Amino acid sequence: MYAVIKTGGKQYKVQEGDTLRVEKLEGTENGEIEFNDVLMFSDGENVTLGQPAIEDAIVKGHILEQGKGKKVLIFKFKRRKGYRNLRGHRQQYTAVKIDSILV
């Protein structure tokens, strides 16, 4: 049994017991979280598609961690002009463990 959920502008295929990193969500560690945008659900035999989402379908989980990803360096350079610019960015994420899929 699996479902496809939408959060943070991205889609994720999830099953019960899965751990995934999504874009930062509000909440504390060990806090409960629900995803209401369930786009697809499959129980192994039947597939249910939403238009765009399945009504009354909820994926429940809890937050494992709030953190930051690896640093990405952005380096701009123009030759012969003495222009150099170095910036860094660390994207925030939320690690979520999926507990149940309810349809």
Swiss-Prot record:
- Molecular function via GO: rRNA binding; structural constituent of ribosome
One GO cellular component term of this record is: ribosome
Q: For this entry, list what GO says about its biological process.
A: translation
Segments spanning the bilayer are: none
**What's the superkingdom here?**
Bacteria
Protein keywords: Ribonucleoprotein, Ribosomal protein, RNA-binding, rRNA-binding
**Matching Pfam families, A to Z?**
Ribosomal_L21p
Self-association and partners: Part of the 50S ribosomal subunit. Contacts protein L20.
Purpose: This protein binds to 23S rRNA in the presence of protein L20.
| Family to which this protein belongs | Belongs to the bacterial ribosomal protein bL21 family.
UniProt protein name = Large ribosomal subunit protein bL21
- Tell me which species this is from: Desulforapulum autotrophicum (strain ATCC 43914 / DSM 3382 / VKM B-1955 / HRM2)
Its gene name is rplU
